[in-house]
């Protein structure tokens, strides 16, 4: 039978039919178990748990056949007795749907719309057959090439360059768009690259050869200014380079392209064209400032990410502008919300310079209603009714600040991305999307049961905004492959938007394609002036040690820290995150509390939540209450320390290193983590790290080599893994050093801000170019999106109550 499967291509239903014939009783036993659960949804881990409960003999028969393959690939099972429907994912980005009648053992294949219709019956009961709005973006991309190999996911720009370079350079006529593109560049009224003396591709090639010949006769270091007038006369303007050597390199790159197009040469050349001088970065929600805000509601890793991003980006822009031979001053503006009630932060200040930069600022624009400016903080789940007016106000402020349009607009998170989409649409500017976290993935079943969560989270609005932005944008940056398409066993954040339903609102039969060439993996790093290895003793910030000693070991219990560590000789398990359900800090505390061996080996220190003031965040309040209960239930005082959120990043860097001194470990136990900046920070300091297998950390860490993956759904196993690590370290102290060094090596290879900023600017150039010379601006889909925005999103946003002032 194995040979049969290898030599014949069967549909999923046919393969299951064969297996049903051969293993009828075993399959019936399992499906009956699942059906007995009653009406509802089983996630992948629950389906596998049910499989593991059947007798071993039955399991063995099913494991190697088609049914075992289907079961391992099943991401969810919908139970509506006597039917069980399965969403099967043979590989990332590829989905098949089927349902089985458990009583008759009949298998049916389903289309995405049919599967979603069936799923909706969980909520709506038997459908009345009324028309349901179905969203399908696939027809708009039907004529556009897409890769099919998994290795192409997240490498969109390489695929695009390969495909379109061949198409663009195949004859003289096809070179006109490139010529037009090079002629349209100007800044503040000054023409760049080419002037109107060059009218056609033949003239361009002639001029380039003439310039190449001349540059071969002058010293490489000759400044551009010395031959600028000569070049202007033949049609070349500033922007090719700052000296003869650099200009010659650029000209030869273009000549090579015209002669024999090559995707790598194309990308290199486009990366040299002066295109990006003004960048706008949007992050409206939370308390966006540089000091004393980390740990405030909705204020965490995203703020750190953007500030580090901006510093690296400005450095790279200045470097490129100098190499291009220009004397232009770049601007980067971080657009966030102005908060008149700034509660001890700078969030009430309109313009604030970013530390460590020369030309980058935070520009704050308030939320506004007909009644005036909104003064207080608003949860990220409640910002939706303000954003359309906010976009108009931001456009007005940008015109004043930049005296023109930006060259790139970068959105962050759902609110920043929809504002970025509206601005890019209005201004005709290249748009980049960074999700950070898509809430649909963080809250399982939040689509099908959206009505239950609507009053608290307004997910109908947020999921609609996400869908709009990811389809509108020119390119999407993710930190990891996992964020796009998950892994063999887990669904990616973006992938979860391929097909889903919001019963009563609309049904998404094709929301996003993870193979779309707009996806690019560009991983950030940690600020290496703050986060550096604990072994670099000359750089260690020993002046912080008394304060850190107080935080960790003081016998005083107050609003800053409660519970004490009685045995200071033990290593410390350390974690630091927002105190919310998804970050799962209370989950880690419970794993620790339940495992006597782990408690014997190590202490646990948690930095999360702010006990110094009453939280406005309902989820944080609930997690605080849970934490107090765990301390009492497991009698943790003596082995556990709970520290309020720490906002001094520089001191936090040294705190990681002090944990290294105890030969401890960092644990990131999140239910789901899009990237895992704290994971990178900890590893950059040399701290062995255990992090969730759901999301980005699974990619950052090579399990067993540069750290360890833990499953937040199996806390007992995670605790046992920690026990195993610390027992090995006790027997062999070099084991700790081995994991620490491997973690550092992993960071140096892949996760630095310099690599990130170079990539972002190159992507902007490439997508800007392709948008100009092809149909990559996707005009048809944008018309569809305009209608979706006006008829669906706007009404949903208006339904969210305005915050009480």
Curated annotation (Swiss-Prot):
GO BP annotations listed: nodulation; sucrose metabolic process
Instruction: Give the source's domain of life in one word.
Output: Eukaryota
Which controlled-vocabulary keywords does the entry list? Glycosyltransferase, Nodulation, Phosphoprotein, Transferase
Catalytic activity field: an NDP-alpha-D-glucose + D-fructose = a ribonucleoside 5'-diphosphate + sucrose + H(+)
Presence of the UniProt keyword Glycosyltransferase in the record = yes
Q: Where is this region: GT-B glycosyltransferase?
A: 275-752
Q: What is its EC number?
A: 2.4.1.13
Annotated membrane-spanning segments are: none
* Gene Ontology molecular function: any one: sucrose synthase activity
Q: Which InterPro entries match?
A: Glyco_trans_1, Sucrose_synth_GT-B1, Sucrose_synthase_pln/cyn, SUS_EPBD, SUS_N
PTM field:
Phosphorylated on serine residue(s).
Q: Which residues carry this modification: Phosphoserine?
A: 11
Quaternary structure note = Homotetramer.
Q: Its biological function?
A: Sucrose-cleaving enzyme that provides UDP-glucose and fructose for various metabolic pathways.
What name does this protein carry? Sucrose synthase
């Amino acid at each position: 039978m194995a040979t049969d499967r290898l030599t014949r291509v069967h549909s999923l239903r046919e393969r299951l039919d064969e297996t049903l014939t051969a293993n009828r009783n075993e399959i019936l036993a399992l499906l009956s178990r699942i059906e007995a659960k009653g009406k509802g949804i089983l996630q992948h881990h629950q389906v596998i748990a049910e499989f593991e409960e059947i007798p071993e003999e039955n399991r063995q028969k099913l494991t190697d056949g088609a049914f075992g393959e289907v079961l391992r690939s099943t991401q969810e099972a919908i139970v509506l007795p006597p039917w069980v429907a399965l969403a099967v994912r043979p590989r990332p980005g590829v989905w098949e749907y089927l349902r089985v009648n458990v009583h008759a053992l009949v298998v049916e294949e389903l289309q995405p719309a049919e599967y979603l219709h069936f799923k909706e019956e969980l909520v709506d009961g038997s459908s009345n057959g009324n028309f349901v709005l179905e969203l399908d973006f696939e027809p708009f991309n039907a004529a556009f090439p897409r890769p099919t190999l998994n290795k192409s996911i997240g490498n969109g720009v390489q695929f695009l360059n390969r495909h379109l370079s061949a198409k663009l350079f195949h004859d003289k006529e096809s070179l006109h768009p490139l010529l037009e593109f090079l002629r349209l560049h100007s800044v503040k009224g000054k023409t760049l690259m080419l002037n109107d003396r060059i009218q056609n591709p033949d003239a361009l090639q002639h001029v380039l050869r003439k310039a190449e010949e001349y540059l071969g006769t002058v010293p490489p270091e000759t400044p551009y200014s010395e031959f600028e007038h000569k070049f202007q006369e033949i049609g070349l303007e500033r922007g090719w380079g700052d000296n003869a050597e650099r200009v010659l390199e650029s000209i030869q790159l273009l000549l090579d392209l015209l002669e024999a197009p090559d995707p790598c040469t194309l990308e290199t050349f486009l990366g040299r064209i002066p295109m990006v001088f003004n960048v706008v970065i949007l992050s409206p929600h939370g308390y966006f400032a540089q000091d004393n805000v980390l740990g405030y509601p909705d204020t965490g890793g995203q703020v750190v990410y953007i500030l580090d991003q901006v510093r690296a980006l400005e450095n790279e822009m200045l470097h490129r502008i100098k190499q291009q031979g220009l004397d232009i001053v770049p601007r980067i503006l971080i657009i966030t919300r102005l908060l008149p009630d700034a509660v001890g932060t700078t969030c009430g200040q309109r313009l604030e310079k970013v530390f460590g930069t020369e030309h980058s600022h935070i520009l704050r624009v308030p939320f506004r209603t007909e009644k005036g400016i909104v003064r207080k903080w608003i949860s990220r789940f409640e910002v939706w009714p303000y954003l359309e007016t906010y976009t108009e106000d931001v456009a007005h402020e940008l015109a004043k600040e930049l005296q023109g349009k930006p060259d790139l607009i970068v959105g962050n998170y759902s609110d920043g991305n929809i504002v970025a989409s509206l601005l890019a649409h209005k201004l005709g500017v290249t748009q980049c999307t960074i999700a950070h976290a898509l809430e649909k993935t963080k809250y399982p079943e939040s689509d099908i049961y959206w009505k239950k969560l609507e009053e608290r989270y307004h997910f109908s609005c947020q999921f609609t905004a996400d869908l709009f932005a990811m389809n509108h944008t020119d390119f999407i940056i993710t930190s990891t492959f996992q964020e796009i398409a998950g892994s063999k066993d887990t669904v990616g954040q973006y992938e979860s938007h391929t097909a889903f339903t919001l019963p009563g609102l609309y049904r998404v039969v094709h929301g996003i394609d993870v193979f779309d060439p707009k996806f690019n993996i560009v991983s950030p790093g940690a600020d290496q002036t703050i986060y550096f290895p604990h072994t670099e003793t000359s750089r260690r910030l020993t002046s912080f040690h008394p304060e850190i000693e107080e935080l960790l070991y003081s016998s005083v219990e107050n609003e800053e820290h409660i519970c004490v560590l009685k045995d200071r000789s033990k290593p410390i398990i350390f974690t630091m995150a927002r105190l919310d359900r998804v970050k799962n800090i209370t989950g880690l505390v419970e794993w620790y509390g339940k495992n006597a061996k782990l408690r014997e080996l190590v202490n646990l220190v948690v930095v999360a939540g702010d006990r110094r003031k009453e939280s406005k965040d309902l989820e944080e309040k609930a997690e605080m209450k849970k934490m107090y209960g765990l301390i009492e239930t497991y009698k943790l005082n003596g082995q556990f320390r709970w520290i309020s959120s720490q906002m001094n990043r520089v001191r936090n860097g040294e705190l990681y290193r002090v944990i290294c001194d105890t030969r401890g470990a960092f644990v990131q136990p999140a239910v789901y983590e899009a990237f895992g900046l704290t994971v990178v920070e900890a590893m950059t300091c040399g701290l062995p790290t255990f992090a969730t297998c759901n999301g980005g950390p699974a990619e950052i860490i090579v399990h067993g080599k540069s750290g360890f993956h833990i499953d937040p759904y199996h806390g007992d196993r995670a605790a046992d893994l920690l026990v195993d690590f610390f027992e090995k370290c006790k027997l062999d102290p070099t084991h700790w050093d081995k994991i620490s060094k491997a973690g550092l090596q992993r960071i140096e290879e892949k996760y630095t801000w310099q690599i990130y900023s170079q990539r972002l600017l190159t992507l902007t150039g490439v997508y800007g170019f392709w948008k100009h010379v092809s149909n990559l601006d996707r005009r048809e889909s944008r018309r569809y999106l305009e209608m979706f925005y006006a008829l669906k999103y706007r009404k949903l946003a208006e339904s969210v109550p305005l915050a009480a002032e």
